[in-house]
């Protein structure tokens, strides 16, 4: 690897930021000095890293010329306010918020489209895709080498941690209220989420699509291009604290060789294929792991040209934080 860099993590006190900081430590990320940053409300807190305790600084006053790489794991408005400022100061940026258009900050995954970096110039301004897009594309990228996909349908069951710590707190609060037979007044969500499924995640636009559905659509298209054909995305809010669960159907041009599909999955690094007669779950398999789990590989009930997949992953650690760290490692090794 290249010489260690000074690195900043913006949004270090959030759930994804905290996981990202932990992975930098676990993976011995090649950094010289780590700066933890957050909004003024969180500045002054202390967080552990390696053998030390680091003070969280205020992103509004931070001089990005003092670091070579910054991970933006904060809210979208923070990235809109500071990502371009960081790049103008000579700092390469990996944004996890989805705030920046793909034409401005192209989504990049090491296992999917790392070659995209060759057409970019330092200092880089890149997006690390949202957890669902990352989990889906990691599984599809190797399969598309053998499958001629004409259409892709995705239904994603999102945990409340997709909304950060506040989502986790709200599900815990609602669950406690209901179990204690107390009246429930929803706060973060527009209706009860505990012991319930919500048919949409957040507000929808004039066509009925939510912001996260639009983001997944744009990022998957940017990562996989025309290899998947038309894409349809539905996101459901599930009463689960952590982890994503995806039901995926690929419509292919020819009957699908299921044995070939499972061979590819079994041979791909970062993917754990759970064989026939079993299936993976978020709680039982994926939480805290660095792999994406795939099961229930089967043909369509009335169409041998369809293949169905069940995908589960830790959305905070694997889907968001690890993909960004892997991208940072690649940048330092070859480009910075």
UniProtKB/Swiss-Prot annotation:
Disulfide-linked positions: none
TM annotation in the entry: none
One family name in Pfam for this protein: Semialdhyde_dhC
InterPro entries xrefs: NAD(P)-bd_dom_sf, Semialdehyde_DH_NAD-bd, Semialdhyde_DH_dimer_dom
GO biological process: amino acid biosynthetic process
Residues in coiled coil: none
GO molecular function: NAD binding; oxidoreductase activity, acting on the aldehyde or oxo group of donors, NAD or NADP as acceptor; protein dimerization activity
SUPFAM superfamilies: Glyceraldehyde-3-phosphate dehydrogenase-like, C-terminal domain, NAD(P)-binding Rossmann-fold domains
SMART domains, sorted: Semialdhyde_dh
Record family assignment: Belongs to the aspartate-semialdehyde dehydrogenase family.
Name used for this protein in its record: USG-1 protein homolog
Organism of origin: Pseudomonas aeruginosa (strain ATCC 15692 / DSM 22644 / CIP 104116 / JCM 14847 / LMG 12228 / 1C / PRS 101 / PAO1)
Lineage, top ranks: Bacteria, Pseudomonadati, Pseudomonadota, Gammaproteobacteria, Pseudomonadales
């Amino acid at each position: 690897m290249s010489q260690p860099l000074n690195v900043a993590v913006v949004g270090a006190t959030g759930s994804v930021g905290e996981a990202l900081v932990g992975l930098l430590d676990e993976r011995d990320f090649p950094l010289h000095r780590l700066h933890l940053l957050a909004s003024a409300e969180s500045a002054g807190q202390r967080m552990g890293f390696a053998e030390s305790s680091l003070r969280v600084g205020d992103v509004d006053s931070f001089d990005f010329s003092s670091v070579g790489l910054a991970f933006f794991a904060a809210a979208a408005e923070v990235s809109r306010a500071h990502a371009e400022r960081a790049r103008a100061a000579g700092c390469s940026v990996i944004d996890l918020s989805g705030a920046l258009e793909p034409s401005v900050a192209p989504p990049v995954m090491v296992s999917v489209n790392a070659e995209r970096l060759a057409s970019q110039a330092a200092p880089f301004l890149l997006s690390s895709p949202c957890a669902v897009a990352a989990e889906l594309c990691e599984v599809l990228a190797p399969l598309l080498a053998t499958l001629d996909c004409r259409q892709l349908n995705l239904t994603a069951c999102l945990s409340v941690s997709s909304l950060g710590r506040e989502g986790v707190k709200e599900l815990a609060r609602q669950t406690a209220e209901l179990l204690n037979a107390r009246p429930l007044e929803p706060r973060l969500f527009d209706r009860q989420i505990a012991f319930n499924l919500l048919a949409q995640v957040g507000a929808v636009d004039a066509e009925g699509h939510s912001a996260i559905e639009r983001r997944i659509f744009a990022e998957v298209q940017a990562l996989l291009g025309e290899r998947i054909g038309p894409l349809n995305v539905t996101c459901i809010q599930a009463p689960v604290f952590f982890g994503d669960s995806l039901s995926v159907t690929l419509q292919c041009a020819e009957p699908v060789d299921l044995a070939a599909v499972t061979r590819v999955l079994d041979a791909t690094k970062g993917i754990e294929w759970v064989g026939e007669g079993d299936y993976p779950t978020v709680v039982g398999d994926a939480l805290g792991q660095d792999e994406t789990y795939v099961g229930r590989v089967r043909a369509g009930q009335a169409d041998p040209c369809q293949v169905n997949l069940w995908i589960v992953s830790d959305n905070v650690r694997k889907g968001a934080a690890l993909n960004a760290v892997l991208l940072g490692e690649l940048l330092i090794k070859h480009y910075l």
